[in-house]
UniProtKB/Swiss-Prot annotation:
<dbReference type="GO" id="GO:0005886">
    <property type="term" value="C:plasma membrane"/>
</dbReference>
<keyword id="KW-0407">Ion channel</keyword>
<feature type="transmembrane region" description="Helical">
    <location>
        <begin position="76"/>
        <end position="96"/>
    </location>
</feature>
<dbReference type="GO" id="GO:0034707">
    <property type="term" value="C:chloride channel complex"/>
</dbReference>
<keyword id="KW-0813">Transport</keyword>
<keyword id="KW-0869">Chloride channel</keyword>
<keyword id="KW-0472">Membrane</keyword>
<keyword id="KW-0868">Chloride</keyword>
<feature type="transmembrane region" description="Helical">
    <location>
        <begin position="31"/>
        <end position="51"/>
    </location>
</feature>
<protein>
    <recommendedName>
        <fullName>Bestrophin homolog 12</fullName>
    </recommendedName>
</protein>
<keyword id="KW-0406">Ion transport</keyword>
<feature type="transmembrane region" description="Helical">
    <location>
        <begin position="244"/>
        <end position="264"/>
    </location>
</feature>
<comment type="similarity">
    <text>Belongs to the anion channel-forming bestrophin (TC 1.A.46) family. Calcium-sensitive chloride channel subfamily.</text>
</comment>
<dbReference type="GO" id="GO:0005254">
    <property type="term" value="F:chloride channel activity"/>
</dbReference>
<keyword id="KW-1133">Transmembrane helix</keyword>
<comment type="function">
    <text>Forms chloride channels.</text>
</comment>
<dbReference type="InterPro" id="IPR021134">
    <property type="entry name" value="Bestrophin-like"/>
</dbReference>
Length: 434
């Protein structure tokens, strides 16, 4: 199953985000390249010992000349970066298409639950029952079961994990998806060697035909038909990707080029100057070559994993989980107790304001709320001029603090520790709700 790691990337400002990702082991880069790295490192040090101690001076000088000439032509003759880039792009595009065709049953289940409802009871003018209420929940549940059965029969031909779980009909019957009386019908299919996943779909179409003949006024069976056929199309596309993969010569060329490149690195990355003082890097560890091996071989291993996402690696699709989810979620959607709509009440009006908990609010929103509270708490006092008579209008002025925002101005207010949001500045009190 693909390893989830996005929770470790929730906050990019934390210094521990990168170590969390790099220290994961299951499905990691280190795990996929470990064996090849150990083999290559062992071969490198084997060449190192032979070059230093097992041959004489004349042979060593001749070998050094050969190694130098190989090093000059190595990067020219083997365009590693270009080959890997094109190959990974092609494989990643195929991986994305395969992922899009791992079918989920929610759309089909919602269509079945909506357009194949329970039959309502009908009465005549005298109150006599002319048509009893019909419970179609069993029909809806069997349609979901047939969809999952079709998915099992199709995907087990391309997924190793599904094939291991459902190797034969008895294993499928153990899950309840296939019944005893349905097994002979599957065995009678003459082309089951090529495809048998269509059989449960034909059973569903037979059910829809019976419903359409009984309920001629219902014109929505085509919606159910389209959702079911879309679900089946995804199953067929998965089998086609397995039947007709990327041409074999393309991955062969890339995989061979990477191995040959690092085979030559066993010789061209040796330290050839024997008169120079030997440093630790010459004796012990070819650091830059090791980093190049990790990155290039790591990219190649990623391409190998993406090439067959239906295998048994840590990063392959867990189709067994998808089918279990489809069965349980589909049966839940079409069950009668979940198809009834609750009583409708007007709980959201035109004055609806989005609500956020305090820990989800941004600093700007918090500053605006503090500013509104400040303006609402300001006192207003009536001021009457001594020159005004009794009938003159009374003017009002707002009472503010000496160091407030309205007195000091925005710049001095912020310097004194006021609201930090420079975009928030009150123009009129009437603009803010009371």
């Amino acid at each position: 199953m693909t390893i989830p790691y996005l929770a470790d990337l929730k906050d990019q400002t934390e210094c521990k985000t990168c170590p969390k990702i790099l220290t994961r082991c299951k499905g990691s880069l280190y795990k996929v390249i470990l064996h090849e790295f150990l083999m290559t490192a062992g071969a490198y040090f084997g060449v190192f010992l032979v070059f230093r101690f097992a041959i004489n001076e004349t042979q060593r000088e001749y070998a050094a000349e050969v190694f130098k000439k190989l090093k000059e032509q190595q990067n020219v003759c083997i365009p590693m970066q270009m080959m890997l880039a094109f190959f990974i792009a092609t494989v990643a595009d195929q991986w994305e298409k395969i992922f899009e065709n791992v079918g989920y049953i929610e759309n089909a289940a919602l269509a079945v639950a909506t357009f194949l409802p329970d039959g309502k009871e009908k009465r005549d003018n005298n109150g006599n029952v002319i048509l009893a209420k019909v419970d179609n929940s069993n029909v809806r549940r069997n349609i979901i079961r047939y969809l999952v059965l079709s998915q099992i029969l199709g995907i087990r031909d391309v997924s190793e994990l599904v094939k291991k779980r459902f190797a034969n009909y008895d294993m499928i019957k153990a899950t309840g998806v296939l019944q005893d009386h349905e097994e002979p019908l599957l065995k009678k299919v003459p082309c089951k060697t090529y495809a048998e996943s269509f059989v449960p779909i034909t059973w569903i179409m037979s059910i829809l035909q019976k419903f359409a003949s009984k309920n001629e006024e219902n014109l929505y069976y085509d919606t159910v038909y389209l959702e079911i056929t879309d679900f089946y199309k995804k199953i067929i596309k998965l089998t086609r990707y397995d039947l007709i993969p990327i041409p074999l010569a393309y991955p062969q060329a890339v995989f061979l080029a990477v191995r040959i490149y690092f085979f030559f690195c066993l010789f061209t990355r040796q330290h050839l100057d024997l008169e120079e003082n030997w440093a630790l890097s010459h004796w012990g560890f070819p650091l830059l070559t090791t980093l190049q091996f990790i990155f290039l071989v790591g990219c190649m291993k990623v391409a190998e994993i993406l090439l067959n996402p239906m295998g048994q690696d840590d990063e392959n699709f867990e189709c067994n989980y998808v089918m279990d989810k489809n069965l349980f979620v589909g049966l839940t959607i079409v069950s009668s107790e979940h198809t009834e709509c609750p009583e409708l009440e007007e709980v959201i009006g035109d004055d609806y304001v989005p609500w956020y908990p305090d820990d989800c609010k941004s600093k700007e929103e918090k500053n605006q709320e503090e500013l509104k509270k400040y303006l609402e708490s300001v006192d207003f006092q009536a001021v009457t001029s001594s020159d005004q008579g009794e009938n003159d209008e009374v003017s009002t002025m707002m009472k503010v603090e000496q160091n407030s925002l309205l007195v000091c101005g925005r710049e001095k207010f912020y310097e004194g520790g006021g609201f930090r949001n420079s975009d928030v500045y009150p123009k009129q009190r009437a603009n803010y709700p009371h």
